[in-house]
Structure formats: structure tokens, C-alpha cells
Design a protein with these regions (language model features):
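Sec-dependent signal peptide recognition
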Residues: 2-8
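Hydrophobic h-region of N-terminal signal peptides that target proteins for export
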Residues: 10-18
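Transmembrane beta-strand segments of Gram-negative outer membrane beta-barrel proteins
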Residues: 21-40, 69-73
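Signature for the C-terminal beta-barrel architecture of outer-membrane proteins
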Residues: 22-25, 101-102, 139-242
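Transmembrane beta-barrel architecture of outer-membrane proteins
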Residues: 28-30, 51-57, 72-74, 88-93, ...
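Surface-exposed strand-loop-strand hairpins of Gram-negative outer-membrane beta-barrel proteins
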Residues: 33-54, 236-238
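Extracytoplasmic loops and strand-loop junctions of Gram-negative outer membrane beta-barrel proteins
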Residues: 40-43, 76-78, 127-132, 183-189, ...
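Outer membrane beta-barrel
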Residues: 61-177, 210
Length: 242
């Protein structure tokens, strides 16, 4: 993943404002706190009543003068005072995209969102959940990809090639939001012998008829939703990605 994201970053930086266009830069630093009124329930959990976290996000977006190219670079940093497994350095977005008359090509890392009205969060097909960030499952990790979108009168077809798999983040032994046994993310089990280097594919068709949106998806690859098995010593849970 690091090599792919490095290429993505170099591509983004090479499309600089010096070549024309417009760049928007913004950022934020958040101080977060979680308060716990009850004592820890499981062995190993930190017993402090207050858990502090610092989150930093920078957002850089560039658009060329012709309006057919854009780039984004959005690094995300999180540091937790109690649980080191919540520490995270991620690229939510780091891509370059070119838009033609009826197609679009995107290369890099991206966070894909297909709407909140669907019965299942289909974004989970593309992006992995940052469960250590928040237990509601809404926080996502950036996904390295190459995508091609074709626009036709009968609908929109988008294909995704994802050359690297992102493992789900989990709270560590010290964390309060965890199951009785902590999840051992260092010893994840994969069904595929390629492990995190397995190439995943997604094909999506979308269209609308009046006020009705239609979306059909075909996925081939490693599931973002792990199942769990106990470790050999019975002291932790191992995530299994099928």
C-alpha cells in the first residue's frame, strides 16, 4: 500500500497550482474526550475516567482551468493518550482524476460514498471501516484504487480495481470499547494466499427513473467484514478475511 500511495501522492503533487487552476486548502485540529463513569469490565482495560484524543485533518483540493482535471490530498492523523491501537495515519483521499465528455478516470486513494438511503452501507464494499475511530461504523479508511466511470443514456457504469486491502482497525487491550477478548490485528488470517495484496474488483451500475434511484453492484475480492476465531492461547480474537 505504501508504494501505491506514494505514487498517488507524487501524481497529486505534480498537478500543482503552478500549472494553472485553483487550489483550496483547509484544515482542522480537534481535541476529543471520552468520559467513563463505570469501572472497566474486562482485564487489561485502562481505568482512567477520561480518554483524550487529538485529531488533525488537512484538505487540499485542486481544479484546473478547463474543469476536466482535479486532484485531492486529505491526510488524517489521530493520536490517543490511552490506547495506542487508536493511533492512525491515513490518507482519506490522495488522487488525480480526469473527466472527459462521457467518462472519468481516477487514480489514487479515495473514499467512495453511494448514499445514505440504501438499506446497507454499500460504501463498505469499497472502503474499510475505522472501527477504532468510532463504533458506529461510519468512519472509513482511504482505499487505493483505479476507477473508470462511463456515462451513457441508459445509465452509469463504474469499474473499480483495488490493488491493496485495508484491514479493519480495532480498539486495543487498553481500550474501553472492545469485546471481552481483544482483537489481535497483527495476526489477521486471510482466505486468499495473496493476503492484503489480493486485487479486488467492483462493477457498479446506477441510473434513475423519475424519483427512483437504481444501483446494482458486483464484487469480487476480500470481504471488508471480518469474522473472528480465538487465538491458539485463547487470549485474543483473530480477524479472518474471506
Amino acid at each position: 500500500m505504501n508504494r501505491f500511495l506514494l505514487v498517488s501522492l507524487l501524481a497529486v503533487l505534480s498537478i500543482s497550482p503552478a500549472r494553472g487552476g485553483e487550489a483550496d486548502i483547509s484544515g482542522s485540529v480537534e481535541l476529543q474526550a471520552r468520559a467513563f463513569w463505570n469501572d472497566p469490565q474486562w482485564v487489561g482495560q485502562d481505568d482512567q475516567a477520561l480518554q483524550g484524543t487529538v485529531v488533525s485533518t488537512t484538505e487540499i483540493r485542486w481544479y484546473n482551468d478547463d474543469g476536466n482535471q482535479r486532484a485531492a490530498f486529505i491526510p488524517y492523523l489521530r493520536w490517543d493518550a490511552t490506547d495506542e491501537e487508536r493511533n492512525l495515519a491515513d490518507l482519506k483521499e490522495a488522487y488525480w482524476a480526469f473527466e472527459g465528455d462521457d467518462y472519468e478516470v481516477l487514480v489514487g486513494a479515495n473514499t467512495v460514498f453511494w448514499g445514505v438511503t440504501e438499506s446497507v452501507h454499500l460504501v463498505d464494499i469499497i472502503n474499510q471501516t475505522d472501527f477504532a475511530g468510532d463504533i458506529d461504523g461510519e468512519d472509513k479508511l482511504g482505499q487505493p484504487m483505479v476507477s473508470l466511470m462511463l456515462q451513457r443514456d441508459w445509465g452509469e457504469i463504474t469499474g473499480f480495481v483495488m490493488p491493496y486491502f485495508r484491514e479493519r482497525t480495532f480498539t486495543g487491550v487498553d481500550g474501553r470499547f472492545r469485546p471481552p477478548l481483544p482483537v489481535d490485528t497483527d495476526n489477521a488470517v486471510y482466505e486468499s494466499s495473496d493476503k492484503e495484496k489480493h486485487v479486488d474488483l467492483v462493477l457498479r451500475y446506477s441510473h434513475y427513473i423519475g424519483d427512483i434511484d437504481i444501483g446494482l453492484n458486483v464484487f469480487s475480492g476480500t470481504s471488508r467484514e471480518p469474522r473472528f476465531i480465538p487465538s491458539a492461547d485463547g487470549q485474543s480474537l483473530l480477524p479472518v478475511y474471506d
